[in-house]
Amino acid sequence: VSTDADANLGTTAVREGFAFDEAALADWMRSHVDGFAGPMQVAQFKGGQSNPTYRLKTPGKSYVLRRKPPGALLKGAHAVEREAKVLVGLEQANFPVAHVYGLCTDNAVIGSWFYVMDMVEGRIFWDATVPGVSRSERAAIFDAMNAAMAQLHGVDYQAVGLGDYGRPGNYFERQIARWSRQYCDDTDAGRDPNMDRLIAWLPANIPANDDATTITHGDFRIDNMIFHPTQPRVLAVLDWELSTLGHPGADFAYNAMMYRMPPAIVAGLAGADIAALGIPGEADYCAAYCARTGRAAMPAYDFYMAFNFFRLAAIFHGIKGRVIRGTASSAQAKERVAVLPELMALAWQQAVKAGA
């Protein structure tokens, strides 16, 4: 993987409909960003982020701007103010995130709310098998990812001003109800017997007396992390759009889904010779997280897995509905729809493993 963020994330000229008044932004930067000095060049990151993301390059340093999209928005979606809030809180806890310089809630500056943060330079590994590094470094990279997740779940969210960042408690109940409703309501995308079985099984099998609450990332994958250019060290965890107060076991199992996920669905390790690669096995990876977080074990781990596969299948099912309705036309969206039956079958397999 290139150590150059341009090659990893790829910038392009600002796309039509996403341009803004760069002079107005430069004025805001001068007032809010210590040490800012122009001139400033603006480029847009490629990729279909729901919040358009830009690189602001000056002779001295580069910054990243994330904004709400222009135009009418769904209530609660594109909440850049939540992203900025969690980043500020986590930086106070010395968790590896990009430094936020400021949040702007005045539409007059560039047309929508935005925040500006540091551009963190390093390596992003798009493939979970982490090609191009030595076996020992690969092991250390996985250990660093495991340690980062344990550190996140150990943050005292009240102490860093995130006590109101979500609803503590009943996480599984609320999430299962939400995704079940979304699946059932999207009649265009149809029904699947594996999903129907999960919708019946999951709420009846939520582990008792298991109501821990921590900050959860919601999409903790190796490709959402920036590693040091030459060391197996996490410099920043990216993409906090799905973060909330949630259940740490669910967040950890989402990360560990890579062990049970074929590479064709989402960056997965299923079928890879992980021992030859130097990647810890699933049981060892789980034990390392438990040791770091003071747990003797994770008895409900297979339930957490079933829940996460179900949640991901529900998200992909929603994409299928949008493809059918013609509101999601990207090649990536169509690829996700193609693997949906396999993903739903895999989700039910996790429930069987958990005793269904």
Where are these regions (language model features)?
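Juxta-kinase regulatory segment immediately upstream of eukaryotic protein kinase catalytic domains
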Residues: 2-36
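Catalytic-loop of the protein kinase fold
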Residues: 215-217, 222
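Active-site activation/catalytic loop segments of kinase-like enzymes and analogous catalytic loops
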Residues: 250-293, 307-326
